[in-house]
Design a protein with these regions (language model features):
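Nucleic-acid endo/exonuclease domains
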Residues: 1-114, 118-168
């Protein structure tokens, strides 16, 4: 089946697809802000410029589109019928780059959370976002747990001086 759009129309359509401020990303950002989580966007010093960076939690959140990042088993990831080899190569390169970015962030000591576009569809959105908040709180508590200090067993010290013995 051939493309219904002209080459020029398809070019304009594809050029309009943005990589930042996507609807799924904005949903996650609004949820985080409403819950009191403060973050930075597309941090330039981190590998891959993660979508959302929470420094306090040492966590990066990547909001991935199912098509562009090749979400296996997802109904939104379907390779187009035209120019198939190009799309397979492009999505494979995206997945390899994603894997490399996750590996480099882990080496730097950063936690990473990947949220897929399909996990933000209305039927499962609330569950996904609540799970995100739970995960962030868990990460914070694990990284900042209270350390107990064990003291060696010793003879208890005396609080008061011994009474002097008087002679009668």
């Amino acid at each position: 089946m051939s493309d219904r759009l002209t080459i020029e129309q398809r070019h304009n359509n594809m050029a309009a697809i943005r990589g930042k401020d996507t609807k799924p990303e904005i949903l996650v950002r609004k949820f985080l802000w409403a819950r009191g989580f403060r973050y930075r966007l597309n941090h330039p010093r981190l590998p891959g410029k993660p979508d959302i960076v929470l420094r306090k939690y040492r966590t990066c959140i990547l909001v991935n589109g199912c098509f562009w990042h090749g979400h296996e088993g997802c109904k939104y990831y379907v390779v187009p019928k035209s120019n198939t080899q190009f799309w397979q190569d492009k999505i494979r390169r995206n997945r390899e780059r994603d894997h490399e970015v996750l590996h480099r962030l882990a080496e730097m000591g950063w936690h990473t959370i990947v949220i897929w576009e399909c996990e933000l569809k209305p039927a499962v959105r609330e569950k996904t976002l609540e799970s995100l908040a739970f995960t962030l709180n868990h990460i914070f508590l694990e990284d900042h747990h209270i350390r107990r200090y064990e003291l060696p067993e010793a003879k208890p010290a005396m609080v008061a001086e011994p009474e002097p013995r008087h002679r009668d």
